[in-house]
């Protein structure tokens, strides 16, 4: 039931970004906040806590297989973290994110950053409250580490710095070699390509990578949005792109990139559907799948 509620929220977010009329933002924020409220109540219920306690204390716990133990671990992690967050804060974050995205679109359209700044500050303040509340249960040294764990479990800012410092040494050498060759004619990249033509190319690229949007058993679709993203769950995973007539490669790369995300989500084992383990491992893994398709 929790997975169903969360997947319903994902599709509502997709609607907000793709099909929602301008006047619908307030209603959409209420809808998303309500679903988040239900999900939070399900996660933090006394019954959920009692069930987890009973499972972990049961004499048969050690006989569970690896997948079963992983499910228990992930359920316990979600429960422990959710119980540290007040329902009001959880709801406020979702509402502000919804309003913030809408204002960001308007600010981007008129190229006025100041329009978005107040909403970004509100999101930042709410997120800081969340991070501070989660530090202890996550064993994080800093609020930022607590937030990183949401996206890349067990990762820290110190480890990221160490990894990036190591990568920089090799990448700098590669960039130096690239910069030695700047006499390449890239004029074709800005040649005007009508949007309908780009759409056909995008559909062909999706078909090439086996992201199905056409068959009677299709689990995907491609829509237009301000900023490309992927959302959905197992048999309904949707991607978006945007089109610029003078930058046709933008839509191609985004379809390949988001298609990679979509294929990863659709490729999760069906036997894990509705289980805690039946979700993406981390954002790092997710991005590796999307960049593999995009770059290869």
What are these regions (language model features)?
Residues 135, 243, 250-270, 287-291:
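Active-site recognition of the HExxH zinc-binding catalytic motif
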Residues 28, 164, 195, 245-248, ...:
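Active-site-proximal structural scaffolding
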Residues 1-155:
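A well-structured
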Residues 208-217, 262-271, 296:
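Secondary-structure transition/capping motifs at alpha-helix termini
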Residues 20, 274-279:
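Short beta-alpha connecting loops at secondary-structure transitions
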Residues 9-16, 75-77, 180-181, 235, ...:
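Short acidic (Asp/Glu) and glycine-rich catalytic loops that position anionic groups and cofactors
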Residues 93-248:
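Contiguous, non-catalytic segments that form substrate-binding/exosite surfaces or channel walls
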Residues 279-296:
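Post-HExxH zinc-binding segment in Zn-dependent metallohydrolases
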């Amino acid at each position: 039931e929790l997975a169903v509620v969360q997947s319903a929220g994902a599709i509502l977010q997709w609607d907000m970004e793709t099909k929602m009329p301008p006047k619908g933002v307030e209603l959409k924020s209420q809808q998303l906040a309500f679903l988040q409220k239900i999900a939070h109540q399900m996660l933090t219920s006394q019954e959920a806590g009692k069930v987890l306690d009973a499972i972990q204390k049961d004499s048969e716990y050690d006989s569970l297989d690896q997948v079963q133990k992983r499910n228990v671990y992930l359920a316990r992690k979600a429960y422990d973290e959710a119980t540290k967050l007040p329902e009001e804060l959880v709801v406020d974050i979702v509402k502000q994110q919804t309003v913030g995205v809408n204002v960001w679109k308007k600010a981007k359209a008129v190229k006025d950053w100041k329009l978005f700044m107040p909403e970004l500050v509100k999101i930042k303040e709410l997120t800081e409250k969340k991070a501070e509340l989660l530090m202890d249960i996550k064993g994080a040294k800093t609020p930022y580490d607590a937030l990183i764990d949401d996206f890349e479990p067990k990762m820290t800012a110190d480890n990221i710095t160490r990894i990036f410092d190591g990568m920089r040494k090799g990448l700098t050498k590669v960039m130096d070699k690239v910069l030695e060759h700047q006499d390449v004619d890239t004029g074709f990249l800005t040649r005007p390509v009508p949007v309908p033509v780009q759409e056909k190319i995008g559909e062909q690229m999706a078909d090439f990578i086996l992201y199905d949007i056409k068959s009677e058993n299709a689990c995907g679709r491609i829509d237009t949005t301000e900023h490309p993203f992927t959302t959905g769950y197992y048999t309904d995973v949707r991607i978006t792109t945007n089109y610029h007539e003078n930058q046709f490669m933008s839509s191609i790369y985004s379809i390949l990139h988001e298609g990679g995300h979509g294929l990863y989500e659709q490729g999760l084992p069906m036997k894990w559907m509705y289980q805690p383990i039946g979700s993406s491992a981390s954002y790092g893994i997710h991005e590796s799948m999307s960049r593999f398709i995009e770059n290869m």
